[in-house]
Amino acid sequence: MKVIEMVSLSTDILQTIDLGKSSVPNLNSQGTFDWFGTLPKRCQELFEDAVLISDRRKSVYGRWDDILSSIHISPTCVVTKRALAQFFTPPDVALYTAFNLLDNYQMEVIFDPCVGYGSLLIATALVLSEKEQLSNWDLVKKLHGSEIDQNTRNIAIKNIAGCLVKISPLLEIGAVEKQLEKQIKLCDFNNYPNKTLSGLRVIVNPPYKEGAKGNIWIPIIDKLVDSNLASMSLILPVAISSSKRTQFLRNKIFANFKKIYAFHHEIRPCPLFRGVDQRISIITATKNLITPHEYITTGFLKHTAGNRMMVWKAPMTKLSKNECNNVFPKVSPLDIAFFKEFESGKNRVRLSEMTITAEHTKEIWIRTTGRYHLLAQYEKPAEITTKWKRLLIPDHIASNFIQAFKNGDLLKWWQIFGDGRDISITSLYDSYRVCL
């Protein structure tokens, strides 16, 4: 299996990003994944428009209607925002996904099980109109999907219809909207449709359910991976694409698909690389290829809506599957030595493997929340909040345990083996191996 990681950007590129410059340095001499130049001209124009959007309330596809404006402006409750599908996939992500999965791939229909505001189906329509020269009702009838929120479904139908009319001016927008109402269903994800479709299926955003812990959609993805799809794309929270609890899904993807592209994209602070942010992963997988397993991924790139092009042009370096440990890589070349030492070290022991007796233990208070603010101390905190946890540690390793917090050893372990969130006390206790 060939595994490639596109590592963190060089200093001059980071300066370009930090200064907000629009020019993109020439990285081809370093070896890059650059797909933009192969796009049809019309797709390039859409992409260029998409990456320049700095205000998510604006749309390259036309005017946002009053419903969308109310979703962005009025709700302050997180539950309400999620229920109204506040978090949408950026247009450039949708365009990349559609362009790659629809390349030389004949299908009956394209099905998006979580439509959002329609960005994927809009990008799909554009690519099909260019590559397969589809237009008018032949193009309209290709686009299918489902959505769990009525308001969001209404937005998607209006946005998709507006795009289709731009592609095929002979279409009448009212008639297109009525047809899309039949093809884009209001659906409860707990009752995911069993109907087999011979086209593309994409998880654009995880469906949200009040009170859930963020993984109610994992069985849906499991079902898609086991299906007879020739191609698919998963657009996931990066923590899920890299976390231990979803390793079984990654193993299935590796087993069932031969060529896999993963792009770690967008902005959300997470302690995976120092000073580098990310929000979502895009995993694109293709079956039935003669070529051996191939896995290509970006590093976690820092950018803003004005320079998303950086995500699609990045230096590359190779890692082996064993070094990635079957996890979509979060390991930079600089961390490989630590990675290998931690895996093979004979002088490390897990806390859960040690016998703890009351007379030979020390009380340690640790705080693992707050992004990079990892604290460990013997003294009981003056104010005990939910952020502080109490652990009993054997005497002879207590000082080493505290030192791991201070010297960055524990943080580096979490960057590689964690899932992008605050450190779980259970994971820490069960998995971290303290130096003897």
Each predicted region: which residue ranges?
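Short hydrophobic beta-strand segments
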Residues: 108-112, 260, 361-368
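Signature of N6-adenine DNA methyltransferases within the class I
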Residues: 83, 88-93, 115-122, 148-157, ...
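Catalytic micro-motifs at enzyme active sites that drive phosphoryl/nucleotidyl and oxygen chemistry
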Residues: 99, 132-133, 172, 267-273, ...
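Class I S-adenosyl-L-methionine
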Residues: 2-159, 193, 206, 217, ...
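Short, conserved SAM-binding/catalytic segment
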Residues: 157-170, 174-179
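A general structural motif
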Residues: 107, 138-141, 197-199, 229, ...
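Residues that flank catalytic or metal-binding motifs in active/ligand-binding sites
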Residues: 180, 279-281, 387, 428
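Polybasic, glycine- and aromatic-enriched phosphate-binding surface used to engage nucleic acids
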Residues: 303, 307-436
